[in-house]
Regions:
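C-terminal helical "tail/cap" subdomain of flavin- and related membrane-associated enzymes
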Residues: 1, 21, 62, 252, ...
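N-terminal Rossmann-like FAD-binding beta1-loop-alpha1 element of flavoenzymes
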Residues: 2-28
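Conserved Rossmann-like nucleotide-cofactor binding loop
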Residues: 11, 34, 148
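Active-site-adjacent segment of FAD-dependent monooxygenases/related oxidoreductases
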Residues: 32-104, 369
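Conserved FAD-binding catalytic core of PHBH/FMO-like flavoproteins
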Residues: 59, 63, 79-80, 87, ...
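A short coil-to-beta-strand element that immediately follows conserved catalytic motifs
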Residues: 187-189, 259, 269-285
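FAD-binding beta-loop-beta segment adjacent to the flavin cofactor pocket
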Residues: 285-313
Length: 391
C-alpha cells in the first residue's frame, strides 16, 4: 500500500521506517522547513523507543544512551535520603531523532510540508493537502502531528488537551561545568528531590552531538512547578518578544525575570547540587503539562498516532515510547489483516488501552507529587515504564 505519515518526529519516523520495512510505499511529511531539533532535551529511553534502532538498524544501545544503576533521593541539605538499585537508560531527543532519520531514504522524508487538510476519508484513497500547495494521495494516512494535532482537532473537535496545573522547567549543563562534588553526587543515577507541591529529577544524557563517554555528557533536569491559570501561567508563557505561547517556550524564549525567579527559588529550596545545575543552565526552557483522553484513533483510512492521540503526563518517561509502540502495533495490525479497516480497528483497540492506562497512571503520579504531597521514595509505582511500572 501507499502510506503517508503526517509528522516527522520520533513517532512518525518510527512508523515510516517500520511500514517501509514491511513492504509499503511510505513517505513522511514534516511541516518544519529544516530537520527538527530540541537542543538535546533528555528522555528516558524505554525499550519501545530504542526497539527499531537495536532490532532493525543494528545500533548498539551504548552508542545512543547512558546507563544508570540507581534511583537516588536527596534531602534539602544535599545528603542522600534514599537510594535503591534500578537500571535505567537515558538519551536525548536529538540523539534518537538523528539515528532514526539516518535510516530514512532522503526522498522519503519531506520537509516544509505542513498539512492543511485532507479529503475522501472513507473512499478508496485519501488526499492530503499541504500549506505549500502540494498534495499527496495515498491508500492510508497516519497522523503523527503531535500535541497540537490538526487531524485530532478536525476529527474530534471536542478533544482538547487539559492543563494539569503545572509545567516542566527543563535544561541541561555540560558535566565539566559542574563541581566535582556535584558530579559525584549525581553520577550513575536518576536523582530526585521532592518537596511540597513540586519535585525535580536529574539524570545524565548524551552530549549535544550524541557523545556518551564520561566527561562529554550533559546533566539534564526536569523541574515540575505549579502555576495557576488566569494570569500566572499566561505571564510565564509570554516570551521575550511579548508573544504568549500555549504549549512550550523553547531555549532563549523565556523572559529573563522568570529565569531569575527560578534561580532564586532553586538556591533557597533545592539541594545545593541540584541548585548548582539550575543556576548554571544557560537557556532553560518550559513545557506545559497536559492530559488528553480520546476514545477513537481510527477514522476510515486514517488513524492517529503518538501525541496526536492519547496524551499522558511525562512522569512515566513514556511519551516517545508510546508513539513508537503505536508504530509497532500499527505495522503488526496491517501485517496480520488483509482488510484495511479491520487492521485499523485492531490497532485502535490495542493502543487505546495502552494510552488510557498510561494517562491514569501518570495523572496519579502528578496528583501525588504536585498537590497531595503523598509521594513516597521507593514506591514501585513510581518506576518508569510504558505499560506498567518497570516495563
Amino acid at each position: 500500500m501507499k502510506i503517508s505519515v503526517v509528522g516527522g518526529s520520533i513517532g512518525g519516523l518510527t512508523a515510516g521506517l517500520l511500514l517501509r520495512d514491511a513492504g509499503h510505499d511510505v513517505r513522511v511529511f514534516e511541516r518544519s522547513p529544516a530537520e527538527l531539533a530540541q537542543r538535546g532535551a533528555g528522555i528516558g529511553l524505554l525499550p519501545e523507543t530504542s526497539r527499531y534502532l537495536t532490532e532493525c538498524a543494528g545500533v548498539d544501545i551504548d552508542d545512543i544512551s547512558i546507563a544508570t544503576s540507581h534511583i537516588r533521593y536527596l534531602s534539602q541539605d544535599n545528603s542522600i535520603l534514599h537510594e535503591e538499585k534500578h537500571n535505567y537508560r537515558f538519551s536525548s531527543w536529538n540523539t534518537i531523532y538523528r539515528q532514526l532519520l539516518s535510516c530514512m531514504k532522503p526522498n522519503d522524508y519531506v520537509l516544509d510540508h505542513g498539512m492543511t487538510g485532507w479529503s475522501d476519508v472513507d473512499a478508496t484513497e485519501v488526499t492530503v493537502t499541504f500549506a505549500n500547495g502540494n498534495t499527496e494521495t495515498s491508500d492510508v494516512v497516519v497522523f503523527a502531528d503531535g500535541v497540537n494535532s490538526l487531524a485530532r482537532a478536525t476529527l474530534l473537535p471536542g478533544a482538547n488537551p487539559r492543563y494539569a496545573g503545572y509545567v516542566a522547567w527543563r535544561g541541561m549543563v555540560h558535566e565539566t561545568e559542574l563541581s566535582a562534588e556535584t558530579r559525584t553526587l549525581l553520577a550513575d543515577a536518576i536523582t530526585y528531590f521532592v518537596y511540597p507541591n513540586s519535585h525535580i529529577l536529574v539524570y545524565p544524557i548524551p552530549g549535544l552531538e550524541g557523545e556518551t563517554a564520561p566527561g562529554q555528557r550533559l546533566f539534564n533536569f526536569v523541574w515540575y512547578r505549579n502555576y495557576s491559570t488566569g494570569g500566572q501561567l499566561e505571564d510565564l508563557l509570554t516570551d521575550i518578544s511579548g508573544v504568549q505561547r500555549e504549549v512550550s517556550l523553547p531555549p532563549g524564549a523565556v523572559a529573563p525575570h522568570h529565569i531569575a525567579e527560578m534561580q532564586t527559588h532553586a538556591k533557597a529550596h533545592l539541594p545545593a547540587a541540584i541548585a548548582e545545575l539550575i543556576v548554571k543552565t544557560q537557556q532553560p526552557f518550559i513545557q506545559v503539562v497536559f492530559d488528553l483522553t480520546i476514545d477513537q484513533m481510527a477514522f476510515g483510512r486514517t488513524c492517529l498516532l503518538g501525541d496526536a492521540a492519547n496524551l499522558g503526563r511525562p512522569h512515566a518517561a513514556a511519551g516517545t515510547a508510546k508513539a513508537a509502540d503505536d508504530a509497532w502495533a500499527l505495522t503488526d495490525a496491517l501485517d496480520r489483516n488483509d482488510d484495511l479497516l479491520t487492521a485499523l480497528r485492531e490497532y485502535e483497540n490495542s493502543q487505546l488501552a495502552v494510552g488510557h492506562q498510561l494517562i491514569e497512571r501518570t495523572e496519579l503520579i502528578g496528583r501525588r507529587s504536585q498537590f497531595e504531597n503523598s509521594w513516597v521514595p521507593g514506591d514501585p509505582d513510581l518506576i518508569f515504564g510504558l505499560k506498567a511500572p518497570g516495563t
